Each structure stands twice: as C-alpha cells, then as structure tokens.
C-alpha cells in the first residue's frame, strides 16, 4: 500500500504533485442526497490558498474545483466523487539547482532512499500543495456533519513563534490572515512576520481545532479510537511534529482531582480530556492541537550533501511560506472533519440502533 488513501467508510484518495498539471482526489462513501456544487469549495480553498497576504507564499493558484463524478443535478449519488484542480502557476525553474541536492529539513533525502527517484519541483508529492485536496474533501465532510448532526469544526492559530493570544473571540478569527483569535494583536503579528521575512528565516506555530456538537458514542475502542484516528490524521499534515488531544502534555503535571472531568446533571464540569474518553466521544467539544515546525525552505545558505555524497551549499529559492502554520488552520479543520465523518458512519453501521435510558447531559457548564 502506498498510503495515499484515508478513512474506512468515508475514504479520500489524493493524487498529483506540486508542479504537475493537476491535483485531485476521489471521495468514496459519502451518502447520497447531499447537495453539492463546485462553488461551495471556494471559501475554504481560499482560506488555505497562497498569495493572499505578504506573509505566505506568493504562488497564486485559482484552485477552481471541477467535479468529475458522483454528483447529479446538484446532489451526491453515493458513488465516488472525483474532484480535480488544475495547477496554473508553477515555476519549476526555481528548483533547477537543487535537483541533485538534499535540502536540509525536507523530505528530499528520505524520498530518495525510499524510491530511488524524486520530483524536486516544489517538493513534488511531499509538497503542501497536496493538502489543497484534503481541504476540498473536508468541505464535503463539514457540510454532511453540519446538516446531519449540527456539528461545526473550527480552528485558529494558537501560537506564532513565542506569541500567544492575549484574548479569545471566534469572530476575530475570520477577519485576519493569521486566523488569530485576538484582533488587537494582529499588528504585532504583522510586524513580527515582516521582520522574519526580511531576515530570510522561518518560524513554527500551533493550531487548535474545536468540533462542537459531536454526539457521544463516536469512536471505537482499542485500535479504532477517535483520538487515535485524529492523531494519525493530523500528524499526516506536512510539517506537523506533535498532536495533543484536550490538555495533552499538560496532563503530566496535573493531579487526578484536577484532570478528571466531573459529570453533573448540568453537564461536565471541565473538558481536560478534549471530549474523548476510552477513544469514544463524550458529547463535549472535541479539542485537538498541533504543532508545526518552521519551514526549511530558506534563503539563508546551509551545508548539505548531493546525491553523490559531495558537500554542497544549499540555498532554497522559489516561493515559500515563512510560517507554514498560518495556512494550516483550514487543513487541520478538514482532517478533523474527515475523521469525524468516517467515525460517524462507522458508528451508525454497528451501533446505529443502540439507545440508553441515561439522559444525555450538556457538553459543559460554566459552574
């Protein structure tokens, strides 16, 4: 298996390279009857797109989706949905000098040893360009989850370098290019990124994703845990080096009396577990966080090796993001939505008729 497919019942297979003629995906397992047209993909794809601010790559792609199959008269048919986006703004000449060199911190060296051949143009298959189709598939998952269960999946940038939000307001996230939840800090972020870009360096970031209204019961024990699937899905995103569910690694310094999420008739008293216990959703918000490393595509020279083992000096030209975390928010949202839809369908297949006499308590109360 080449691992280009994701999911068990709701499956997504992506294809294409950064500088190839097109990228695409095939979505299988989407239930029939979901209203869907090409225009619905535009919003999230533009949120992910490059060239929208001076703080991201200058590459400009239209990212217009062509629906090739699986939709008839505006409704999904239950058959595979094939989506295609044509690449129109490749500049492969920017990579002419590194075809035989290994860029430090990139997948060049590992791809070379695995396949014995690699596409150096923009990173080929290892480029974040591939995530465009994940966002497209996420649009389908988000819509189905919202219509079927009222589930919403939202994300925001929770750290940029050493800067963290001084406040939080969901309404601020959509109004700035950083997906930052505190509008008053945006000028600080602008100044920080301007200085970083001038220096030729890059920086890491963190993104948080929150899924609200997830019903209790989604996820499977042991090898199909909801948090396990979320971790695997989020770790598959380019540059992600760590995943937390709920309080994550902060749990190491908490006492049990603090970390346990007490149940009351009014709701859970806290959500340290991130809405998942035993690998199964509790009805609380599902909360996941990712950390993204600083990109290694730098204008600053660094020593490396070529394919013959000779020492070379590598300078990465081309158009790159000084912080890949800025555009990662819609990608992380898409992966969370895809996991939730897959788990929802899996739950319905085995336990759709299960009912309990225990009343469903609210996700959390402010007590």
UniProtKB/Swiss-Prot annotation:
GO aspect biological process, one term: aromatic amino acid family biosynthetic process
Pathway: Metabolic intermediate biosynthesis; chorismate biosynthesis; chorismate from D-erythrose 4-phosphate and phosphoenolpyruvate: step 7/7
Domain of life: Bacteria
Cofactor(s) annotated in UniProt: FMNH2
The enzyme's E.C. designation: 4.2.3.5
Annotated residues for binding of NADP(+): 48, 54
Pfam families: Chorismate_synt (PF01264)
UniProt: FMN binding residues: 125-127, 238-239, 278, 293-297, 319
Alphabetically ordered keywords of this record: Amino-acid biosynthesis, Aromatic amino acid biosynthesis, FAD, Flavoprotein, FMN, Lyase, NADP
Catalysed reaction equations from the record: 5-O-(1-carboxyvinyl)-3-phosphoshikimate = chorismate + phosphate
GO cellular component, one term: cytosol
Free-text remark on how the cofactor is bound: Reduced FMN (FMNH(2)).
Top enzyme class: lyase
GO MF term set: chorismate synthase activity; FMN binding
InterPro entries found in the cross-reference section: Chorismate_synth, Chorismate_synth_AroC_sf, Chorismate_synthase_CS
Tagged with keyword Lyase: yes
Presence of the UniProt keyword Cytoplasm in the record: no
Cited function: This reaction introduces a second double bond into the aromatic ring system.
NCBIfam families: aroC, PRK05382.1
HAMAP family from the UniProt entry: Chorismate_synth
Similarity comment text for this entry: Belongs to the chorismate synthase family.
Assembly behavior: Homotetramer.
Name the record gives this protein: Chorismate synthase
Gene that encodes the chain: aroC
